[in-house]
């Protein structure tokens, strides 16, 4: 999950450096969404724990 966030962040930085503002904004937004979803899933798994079968 965090790997995808970092990939989108790198894409946003490269696009911004090359002058593609719209693409950079979209990639940065996607990176934020992926990071938030990853953190939420991490917190849910942290609080629920492993269930014994």
From Swiss-Prot:
InterPro entries with a match to the protein in the record: DUF1328 (IPR009760)
Protein family: Belongs to the UPF0391 family.
Domain of life from the UniProt record: Bacteria
UniProt-annotated location(s): Cell membrane
Pfam families from the UniProt entry: DUF1328
Residues spanning the signal sequence: none
Transmembrane segments: 4-24, 27-47
Organism: Erwinia tasmaniensis (strain DSM 17950 / CFBP 7177 / CIP 109463 / NCPPB 4357 / Et1/99)
Keyword field: Cell membrane, Membrane, Transmembrane, Transmembrane helix
Name of the protein: UPF0391 membrane protein ETA_06630
Any Gene Ontology CC annotation: plasma membrane
Its membrane topology: Multi-pass membrane protein
Main subcellular location: membrane
């Amino acid at each position: 999950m965090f790997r995808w966030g970092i990939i989108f962040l790198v894409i946003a930085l490269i696009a911004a450096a090359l002058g593609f503002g719209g693409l950079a904004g979209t990639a940065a937004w996607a990176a934020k969404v992926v990071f938030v979803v990853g953190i939420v899933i991490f917190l849910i798994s942290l609080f629920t724990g492993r269930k014994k079968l």
